């Protein structure tokens, strides 16, 4: 018998997360490591759990995540979006609740490119009057 699972893709900054949602006991595995081991910061773990806590599904799913690219914050945001999309695939009625909380929106902010003649994207050399 095939395992029924729901899939969601999430992206943030330069990170991508592929999320597989299965009926289970609440285990979240990121790149074959438990969530608490993968993310050192509590904030990142909270971000990942937000959609599940909002929909009161913390104990009803096992989540398998493959995250790549970017850093901790970007990956946490990507996983959150992926989980939200997978939950909507599982149950369409959760969409309005997740949308209202802002979990269905792809954060479009990207790093601004460095400009020629400047130190960074906007940082110029110090202005000298004389």
Swiss-Prot record:
Pfam families: Ribosomal_S9. GO terms for molecular function: RNA binding; structural constituent of ribosome. Keywords: Ribonucleoprotein, Ribosomal protein. It comes from the Bacteria. GO terms for biological process: translation. Belongs to the universal ribosomal protein uS9 family. HAMAP family: Ribosomal_uS9_B. PANTHER family: RIBOSOMAL PROTEIN S9, SMALL RIBOSOMAL SUBUNIT PROTEIN US9M. This is Small ribosomal subunit protein uS9. The gene is rpsI.
């Amino acid at each position: 018998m095939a395992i029924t699972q729901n899939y969601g893709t999430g992206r943030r900054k330069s990170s991508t997360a592929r999320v597989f949602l299965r009926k289970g006991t609440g285990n979240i595995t990121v790149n074959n490591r438990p969530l608490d081991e993968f993310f050192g910061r509590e904030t990142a773990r909270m971000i990942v759990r937000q959609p599940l806590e909002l929909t009161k599904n913390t104990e009803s799913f096992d989540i398998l995540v493959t995250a790549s690219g970017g850093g901790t914050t970007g990956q946490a945001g990507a996983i959150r979006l992926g989980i939200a999309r997978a939950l909507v695939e599982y149950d369409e009625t959760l969409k309005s609740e997740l949308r209202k909380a802002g979990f269905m929106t792809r954060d479009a902010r990207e790093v601004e490119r460095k400009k020629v003649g400047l130190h960074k994207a906007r940082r110029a050399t110090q202005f000298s009057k004389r």
